[in-house]
Amino acid sequence: MSIKFRPLLLSLIFLLPGVLLAQAPAQAVLPALELEIELDPDTRRFSAQALLTPAAPTFNFALHETLDVTAASVNGKSLGVIAMGRDGALRHWRVALPAGQSLLKLQYGGTLAVLDRSLDQRGVLRSLPPMASEEGSFLPAGGAWYPQPGAAHFTYQVSVSLPAGQRAIVPGHLLSEQVPAEPGGRYRASFEFRQPADGIDLMAGPWKVRERTIARASGAVVKLRTYFTPELDATPGLADAYLDDTRRYLELYAEQIGAYPFTEFSIVAGPLPTGFGMPTLTYMGAEVLKLPFIRASSLGHEVLHNWWGNGVYVDYARGNWSEGLTTFMADYAYKERESMEAARQMRLGWLRDFAAVPQSRLEPLTAFRSRTHGAAAALGYGKSAMLFVMLRDAIGVEAFERALRHFWTRHQFEVASWADLQRAFEQASGRPLQRFFDQWLSRADAPAISVTRASATK
C-alpha cells in the first residue's frame, strides 16, 4: 500500500518553467483549476471543460492521446489551439492568450481506454492512462486527463456527471451530491480541495455508499464513508467494521501527531488490485477489501498517509521518507502492540528482504521515490522503517514523539525532506544527528559485521 506517486505528472512539472518542487506551497497564492466532467462508463465517452488562469500569456499543456481539445476561449472569444506534437502517450498543445486576459476556458474530450482487468498489483503501480468501464473507472492524477495549471501545486474544484447507477469521488471535500431517483437520470457531485494539491484523481463505480459522522473536540465533524460494490456492501458487518476501524485509526494518529487535517475519509473499492492512499481516501481493490487482515494493517497505513505524504508532502527529489515513517508508525507499531516477538519477526523480515536485494539494485534512501519492484520496497519501506526504529532507540521515545509533533506542526501542507525530519529530531533530542542520518541515508549498503577475535572459556 502506498501514497500515489505520479511519475508522468512529475515529468511534466519538471518541464514547466519556474516550478520548484521543494518550495513550501502553502506560502504562495496557488493557481486554481475548475473542471466540469461528463463521463459515460459504458461507452467510455469523456467530455470536460476546464477553467484556469495561466501564469504566462502562452499556455503550454499536455493531455493523454485519447483526448482532443475542441475549443478554447477567453470571455467568450474563441482562441486558436495549436497541436505541438507527441511525446509517447502525450499530446502537447499551446494556446496564446490576448493581452490583459487571463481566465482561460478549455473544452476537450474523447474515448478513454477500456479498464484493463489483466493488470496485476505491479502493473497498477506503473503509469496508467485514464480508463473507464461500468464496473469501475479510474482517472489517475498522472494520466494527463486534465490540463496541468503550470505549477507544482494548485487548488481545484471538480464537478462530475455520470449515468444513474454510477457514483464518483475525487480527493477533497464533497460539496454537493445529487443521486437520481429514476434510471434515466444523471448523478452529479462536486468536490473541492483547498489545500495545495499536486494532482487530481477521479474514480467512479456502481457503488453503494454508507456514511458516518464523528465529532471532533473542536466541535467540527469528520464524515466517514464506504464506497463499496453491491456485493461488498451486502457482506454482513463489513462496511460498519471499516467505518469503526477508520475512526479508531483517526483518533489514534490525531493523538500521536495532531488533528486530522481533512473533513472526511472514505474507503473506496476499485476493480483493480490497487492499494493507494490519497488525501481524504484510500482506493483499494474490492477483492483486497474482503481480506480479514486488511482492517488490522493496511487500512491504518492508508489512514496515516493523510498525515505523512498527503498532509506533509514529500520532496521526492531528495528521497521519499513517508513510506518508511508510515510503515514504522503503522505496520510495525501494530506488531509491537501484538508482542515483542511479533515486532522482532517483522524486523527480521526487513533484514531478509534487504539481504535478498541484488547488489545492482541497491541505492541510498535519498534515491527512493516509490515502490515499483520488490527491491524498492525492501529499501523504501523496510530499510527506511528500520532507520526510525534505531532512531527512536537512540534518542528515546519522548524526544522521538515530540519531534514528530513538531515536524507536523511546522510542515503541514508543505513539502518536506529528510533534512527537515533530521532538524526536527535534533531539536527535540538536543543532540546532533548528522552522522546517524548520513550513514543510513547516503550509503546504499549496510554495515559489514565480522568477528575479529573469539575466545572460549570452560
What spans do the regions from the language model cover?
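Amphipathic alpha-helical substructures
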Residues: 377-458
